[in-house]
Amino acid sequence: MRLTQGCFSFLPDLTDQQIEKQIAYCIDKGWAMNVEWTDDPHPRNSYWELWGLPLFDIKDIASVMFELSEARKSCANGYIRMNAFDASYGTESCVMSFIVSRPSNEPGFYLERTEGAGRFITYTIKRYSVQANAEGSRY
C-alpha cells in the first residue's frame, strides 16, 4: 500500500531534480523549509520528528538538499517529508508538505471495529507495522 499524504501524493516519487525545483519555488515565495521524518505515518499523526533545525533564512537550494541527504542516510527506513512554512502575517502556517523518501515496503493499515451498547460502533485505523513492531524498529 502506498501512503498518500501531502502534495504530489498521487504522483510517482519525486526525483532529486524535481525536489530541487519545489525547494526553489518555496524559497522564491519566501517560505522557510524544514525536513521531518517518522516511522509511524498514521493519517492522524501530524507530529513528525523534526530533522535538525528549521531552515529559516536559508536561500540556497544546496543547503536544503544537504539536510535532506543527511536525513536520508540516518532515517533510511522511515518516511521523510519536506515542509514549507509561510511566516507572513495572516498565514503563519505550513503551506506545502510533500513526502520525499519512503521505505521500500509499506505494509498499510487495517480497520478495527468495536461494537458498544445499543448498536454503537466505533472504528479505529491501525497500522500493520505498529501492531507488529515497537517504535524505531518498524521498517
Curated annotation (Swiss-Prot):
Lineage of the species this protein comes from: Eukaryota, Sar, Stramenopiles, Ochrophyta, Bacillariophyta
Please provide the record's keywords in A-Z order.
Calvin cycle, Carbon dioxide fixation, Chloroplast, Photorespiration, Photosynthesis, Plastid
Which pairs are disulfide-linked?
none
Q: State the species of origin.
A: Trieres chinensis (Marine centric diatom)
One GO biological process term is: reductive pentose-phosphate cycle
Give its localization.
Plastid, Chloroplast
Instruction: Please report which protein family the annotation says this sequence is part of.
Output: Belongs to the RuBisCO small chain family.
Kindly give the InterPro entries that the UniProt entry links to this protein: RuBisCO_ssu, RuBisCO_ssu_dom, RuBisCO_ssu_sf
Record's function text: RuBisCO catalyzes two reactions: the carboxylation of D-ribulose 1,5-bisphosphate, the primary event in carbon dioxide fixation, as well as the oxidative fragmentation of the pentose substrate in the photorespiration process. Both reactions occur simultaneously and in competition at the same active site. Although the small subunit is not catalytic it is essential for maximal activity.
Q: Under which name does UniProt file this protein?
A: Ribulose bisphosphate carboxylase small subunit
Give GO terms: molecular function aspect only.
ribulose-bisphosphate carboxylase activity
Stored HAMAP family: RuBisCO_S_bact (MF_00859)
Coiled-coil positions are none
User: What further note is attached to this protein's record?
Assistant: In this alga, in contrast to plants, the small subunit is encoded in the chloroplast. The basic functional RuBisCO is composed of a large chain homodimer in a 'head-to-tail' conformation. In form I RuBisCO this homodimer is arranged in a barrel-like tetramer with the small subunits forming a tetrameric 'cap' on each end of the 'barrel'.
The record's section on Pfam families has: RuBisCO_small
Q: Name one GO cellular component term.
A: chloroplast
Assembly description: Heterohexadecamer of 8 large and 8 small subunits.
PANTHER family given for it?
A: RIBULOSE BISPHOSPHATE CARBOXYLASE SMALL CHAIN 1, CHLOROPLASTIC, RIBULOSE BISPHOSPHATE CARBOXYLASE SMALL SUBUNIT
